[in-house]
């Protein structure tokens, strides 16, 4: 009886909370961080946006997930982005772009690799760039694995992923992140 009550009340509440986190995420705009992290994705402008943020002075370092599963135009674009380092900002600052292979080709693997590199480099604060539906799950993973302040933002030009697809995919991932922490 108690289990049935927990399921009847708990599942819808959990589902609504996860749906809210996916569809209406908290997006951050910090003035300055030690590094910007770009988690993988091919259908939006997250790489261009991360570089733009760095050029505006938000950070001097960009860490970019370069999954081994990338193919075709996506892989070529990431390769080109990764070889463009260092970049000189308009104000003369040097911006370093460091690409890394995720520990596992998942958001969890990107998180563990990026936070390990951040610790090794002495970064104390991070801004993670992803797409709108991924913001809350990325925040959860990075907050599980990184000791310092973590900010997460989406791109100004959103991906064409449908809200329905994002809700289904990211809600499942969000629940997985809640049940099985990355770190």
Roles of regions detected by a PLM:
Residues 1-27:
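N-terminal type II signal-anchor transmembrane helix
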Residues 18-167:
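A structural signal for short, hydrophobic/glycine-enriched beta-strand patches
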Residues 163-183:
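A transmembrane-helix-recognition feature enriched in membrane-embedded lipid enzymes
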